[in-house]
Amino acid sequence: MSSVAAAAEEAPTAHPQELVRALSLRDAIALVLTVIGTGVFLKAAPMAQIVGSPSKVLLAWLAAGLLSLAGALTYAELGAMMPEAGGEYVFLREAYGDLVGFLFGWSSVMLIASGGLAAVSNAVASFLAAFVSLDGVWITRELHLLGQTVHWQLGGQQLVAVAIIILFTAINARGLQLGAKVQWAATVAKVAGIVVIVLGAFLLSKTGSWSHLQKPVTAQIVPTGVGAFGAAMIASLWAYQGWSNLPMVGGEVEKPERNIPRALIYGMLLVIVVYFVTNLAFFYALPFSEVLTSNSTAYRNALPVASKAAQTFWSHGPQLVSLFFMIAAIGALNGITLMNARVPFAMARNGLFFRPLGVLSDRRVPARAIWFQGLWACLLALSGTFDQITTSVIFAVWLFTALVGSSLFVLRRKLPAAPRRYRAIGYPVVPALFVIVAAWLVLNSLFATPIESAAGLVLIAIGLPFYVFFRATRREVHADGEVAP
């Protein structure tokens, strides 16, 4: 019997409107490994175009990984101290008040998480197109939104994306046990796929040579320098995105004061190793010129770098990589669906979102919140605008990340007597460095993409009238399912 099933059986005396602590350490690590998505297969090319040498690309991967690890060490203390559904929403609410917590939750629910689901589901559909034709496009439109031109289209790929979102929404609304099983299976499959590509590149590649790492090439698109290295770091940080989601299911992790920190730290160390070794394999298998000209904004019709590397040891390598792409994307999709829906659930329980979303199903999962998130993501997936809109929230994502990091310092002073079974390693230096670098990334985004950053702030600010409404009509949903008077 799985740990999830066992926990569910052991909790019949608990109130049916209380979450079940059913996620084991293994399940929690699998959720952290949701981070391993399609980015590791794609990002080497744009990073190479920015910094112009293999060593700098690898260094950027390592630096981004260490930054993410510093963040994980910081989040670990917060997650262990406040193991509740909602994660970052809870941390920001406790440190800075309802408004800041709400604006994070609003952004997560309405754009960041749902946009991520739309993006990943369309990625799965595009990878599926390598095996099945999904070329039909029936409607195309252009919209002008927040100073940007948004291209809208409806076709076979969008419908498949919607079907995929509905499938994984239904799986996770069915129960925590099923969602956790799917996550573990996807994690094992995608790690196995990466191992196949890495071993094939190192042991069987017809073009493999360590000399590929010794030939720096001048970047063709962006000048090198500190700014360029920062841009490369930002590119790789998207591949690390998602490690912070585990605390969102803090209310369902067994022994959270131990397992949340351990899962975050062990999981991130594993991700750093996987990303570094995988990119090292790409540079070993391919001349740097091939990496430079792989699929990216500059070379839209080229093969992804992972496909090129696989092609050096097997003629059907690109098809193999497409399959692994799809598995990795499915794992990310399931993980986002499972974890992020706990944010609107927590907000609704606090009376700061639609109250029905704060009610659990008879299987003790926030099924209504899961379906709300999924259906909203379907609308974004149908529109096809997710990739352009989410570009506008890079600034906001890092703004909230910096705020969460700083909340550790605030809560150390605000709640000095709170139980802390785990304290952030390297405090205050490591959390401070994390906050400083996150703030630098906020400023970097602001100066590099001012229009998109401003648009991101506008999208967040749209939540303000909703906050006023929810505050005016606020009635909290208690853990026993009763609505406060």
Where are these regions (language model features)?
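C-terminal membrane-solvent junction of multi-pass transporters and transport-like membrane proteins
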Residues: Q153-L154, P356-A367, T401-E452, V477
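Hydrophobic, membrane-embedded alpha-helices of multi-pass small-molecule transporters
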Residues: L23-F41, V160-F168, A201-L204, T218-V274, ...
